From Swiss-Prot:
It comes from Tomato yellow leaf curl Sardinia virus (TYLCSV). Belongs to the geminiviridae protein AV2/V2 family. It comes from the Viruses. GO terms for cellular component: host cell perinuclear region of cytoplasm. GO terms for biological process: negative regulation of gene silencing by regulatory ncRNA; symbiont-mediated suppression of host innate immune response. Coiled coil: none annotated. Its main location: host cell. It is found in: Host cytoplasm, Host perinuclear region. This is Protein V2. Keywords: Host cytoplasm, Host-virus interaction, Inhibition of host innate immune response by virus, Suppressor of RNA silencing, Viral immunoevasion. The keyword Nucleotidyltransferase does not apply.
Amino acid sequence: MWDPLLNEFPDSVHGLRCMLAIKYLQLVEETYEPNTLGHDLIRDLISVIRARDYAEANRRYTNFNARLEGSSKTELRQPVYQPCCCPHCPRHQASIMDLQAHVSKAADVQNVQKP
């Protein structure tokens, strides 16, 4: 965890609040499995807090809120079955058989060269 006595403080109170909120959300994120809707929503909320300008933060929050309102509490811990294209999603790094998702399985072929 972040130690306030060993690290620099942000320049503003707002920066400190954002930093503490992100640290808290990272701890909450660890309670969700990586392939669940709850994990995706926590990552989206962290990206809302990290947005640099108001318009971008507002756009991200609107998208986050629509996803949150459209899901029930029971869906938050359920695996997500729909494909997504977010860059932080751990589902894109591995599949069921510990193969990377973008790597196709190679097939053995017989030697077809003429002797």
